[in-house]
Amino acid sequence: MSKLRFRVVEKAFHKKPVEVASPATRPSEYFAKYVFNREKMFKYLPSNVYAKLIDVIDNGATLDRSIANAVADGMKKWAIELGVTHYTHWFQPLTEGTAEKHDAFVEHDGKGGMLEEFSGKLLVQQESDGSSFPNGGIRNTFEARGYSAWDPSSPVFVVDDTLCIPTVFIAYTGESLDYKAPLLKALSAVNKAALDVMHYFDPSVKKIISYLGWEQEYFLVDEGLYAARPDLLLTGRTLMGHEASKNQQLEDHYFGAIPSRVAAFMKDLEIQSLELGIPVKTRHNEVAPNQFELAPIYEECNLAVDHNMLVMSLMRKIARNHGFRVLLHEKPFKGVNGSGKHNNWSLGTSTGTLLMAPGKTSEENLRFITFVVNTLMAVYRHNGLLKASIMSATNTHRLGGHEAPPAIISSFLGTQLSKVLDHLEESTNDDLVSLGGKQGMKLDIPQIPELLIDNTDRNRTSPFAFTGNRFEFRAPGSEANCASAMIALNTAVAEQLIEFKKEVDELIEKGEPKISAIIQVVRKCIKECKPIRFDGNGYSDKWKVEAARRGLDCETSCPVIFDNYLKPESIRMFESTGVMTRKELEARNEVKWDMYTKKIQIEARVLGDLVMNHVVPVAIEYQTKLIDNAYKMKSLFSEEEAQTLSAENLAIIKEISEHTSFIKKHVDEMVEARKVANRITSEREKAIAYHDTVAPMLEQIRYHIDKLELIVDDQMWTLPKYRELLFVR
């Protein structure tokens, strides 16, 4: 096995960048080549069908099934011209991945031959086995039926030879079994609630859109090295491995020159993303070695979520073509930064006005303050739920370290906006809001023009920071489906806006002028949500104490954090907005607890296997060599000289015995702890047992393995080390 390690390292050093040819000179020439977008709809659909479908997409009109056959026929013609032979309903089950079943465009022609067929019925709806996906008890093997239904608001696309149709996935009894269905409901709820409030300022606005811009972080590891690490292969992270002497301490990787093999991968990924209509814009090295980031231009939230899921799928496929494996786990390597997926969220009108951006007039600024303060209120009232929406067995390794936001949800606003809110809070009159524009900064360098400085600085320790025209939710993990966080956030904002309008309308009915009523309720909200505002160091221990004093959710146990979904205020929020029922929330929590348990269970099994089949045998083999050396020293030197000369080896022999004894003892205890936990029938209690009794042992055992790695002869160590995983590119 040790020979394999050195063989894959040597092979990795000789790999060359894969040549990637651009399909055209300008990206705009091949953008959305494989997407059935409006341009293709206009070309392949009858004009009346096109108009009805656009009404569904833009205005949320109910899909008229009478046009389904014409739409399906147009899609089929377009797809066949691209060489497509199959179609699939592409959906997002509660596994945090995507699912698809491919069917061919073929049917019997009744004459012994075949013909290409794709009907409106097949486009709009298909049946699937709901019991074979995580469902929290909603579906059983004996009542397994589930349905996937087309989402026209997210365009159909082609991958390889398959037409992919974005769909929702629901049970036969109507409950959602995916992320898309509740996301669409949450977006509908925030549209209606925000539109009602927006009409105070502009009655002509017809629609409010929730926007999302994600930032996807990831690691790349050479495929050979990846294959030689069973823990990476099976869990997505290293369960052992001592830190390399050099990691990220020189701060030389962030924004550094992109390695040639990685650059080729990035170029390939960008081309294929653009061809699928994903507007990728930014690529760069991240902080940790072999860590990188990809970010697109922001899009409508539902489409952005679909595009992120598609990008993660593309990354996995394209990485292999370049001799890499992509790691999307939030913390694949100990001692260096983990990977997140910042969610840049905002609301805007269908005419292009961003509601989270300051305006040019006092009334526009009041509108801006109104939506910002209502967002803060939503985050304050449901800070525990927002934390639950991003929590997982994998993301828990990243949160709370001095590299990512803490596991306490708070919001950073910046100096200027904080002053404005403080002024409004303390003011006793109804003066309208005035905000300054960007300030200039001269650098006194002749070649450099004056810089325009933003009104907000950046606080990297804040989980929910205002960044000028949007809020940046930094807590979501790199592996997660953005929909989870977006469902919670948009629903919370919708509920708050409904409550806000109710209070304003009550004042107006009592004779209060509209602007005065808005300012009074905004002032009340500013006072109430003040505990969520924090501009200081989120990493400090003082903040943990202060956050608890403010009544913020400071829980750190992942399974317990999930309880926030089932709090009365959470159930009331989801049900009142029509996003999810109590039954759906209970089912999703069952899935979350079960998923947590299984991930820790798999890690424990893998670590136990590695210990007994790799680590301990190698340590004993090296120890045997040292013992043999000590015996031979006795035959060459006097007993006193041999004792002196062998003292260091004898100390190492003893140290190896201590480490291996501890490891074997605690692996046995970990197996027993798993057996005890597995007998618990409640998914919640089982997950808590795994968190409290099994997960801590992983770190305890790892400590002793990592000590052995430093002791054992490097030539004998079988598993690729951190210096190879992180620096071989």
List the model feature ranges, each with a label.
Residues H14-G120, V124-N140:
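Histidine/acidic residue-rich metal-binding segments in metalloenzymes
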Residues E143-L328, N337-G340, L347-E590:
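Glycine-rich, acidic/polar active-site loops that bind/position phosphate-bearing ligands
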Residues S2-A24, S132, T141-P155, T162:
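N-terminal hydrophobic targeting/anchoring segments and the immediately downstream early-domain regions
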Residues S2-L45, Y200, K207-L225, P230, ...:
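Active-site-facing alpha/beta catalytic cores
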Residues E96-G113, S128-S131, R229, G236-T238, ...:
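Short linear, low-complexity motifs centered on an aromatic residue
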Residues I67, F91, S119, P296-Y298, ...:
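Active-site proximal loops enriched in glycine and acidic residues that flank catalytic Cys/His/Asp
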Residues I67-V71, F91-P93, K121-L122, F169, ...:
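Active-site-proximal loop/turn and secondary-structure-junction residues that shape catalytic pockets
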Residues K524-R729:
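C-terminal amphipathic alpha-helical interaction region
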